[in-house]
Amino acid sequence: MDTAATPASDAVPTDTIGADAVRALIDHAILKPELSRTDVDAQLDEAAAYRVFSVCVRPGDVLHAVERLRGTGVGVGTVIGFPHGTTSTAAKVAESLQALADGAFELDMVQDIGAAKSGDWERVQRDVRAVVDAADDTVVKVILETAYMTDDEVVAASRAAVAGGAAFVKTSTGFAGGGATAEHIRLMRETVGPDTGVKASGGVRGLDTLLEMVQAGATRIGTSASARILDEVAHRSSTGAASAVGDDTSSY
């Protein structure tokens, strides 16, 4: 499985997007703290059935997810320092090493949000670099939590993430009261250039929103509404019309 960031110039054309292209964009999020093992298994099975690129699970679920998805072609990623980014760098490194030992193939780390809000970009960069170094060749995505950031901070945080070696910058955890916006995706894409991935997460609950994010420069999508989105692709492909189904406001 190719885990490299997709250059912006190779972003999926939104006027011709098909099911396979949508699948290749999706990290199916299974991150809510209240999910039982039965709930997690149902989501893992859904991800396998819809053949999405990967799942992003809670750290304690990595080993189980790897076993359950073995042979499906669906990768298993996880989150580090989630959702607040306030754990120490040493704790993030330890969490990363455990996740890798359990079989995670990508890591979505939360930046040190407090350091970012303090303008301590050297500290943010060091935090990212420590996880990137621990991850070795594993893809690391840095969650900025854009709901808390000014535009200037989004730019500075994106630069710090890239300087720290991140393969992707990512908008949101989905737990901060605000998710991805096209405006933030454009700003992040303009900042990091064509060779770093940009992941839109939080609030991407339908195909139209996914297409808007891709058009703005996203090369990966984090969502728990994968089934709804891919069902919408199939519906439009077969009928040429948008579905009447409303947005699922309960999704990540």
PLM segments and residue spans:
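Short hydrophobic "strand-cap" motifs at the C-terminus of beta-strands
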Residues: S201
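Short beta-strand scaffold positions
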Residues: C56-V57
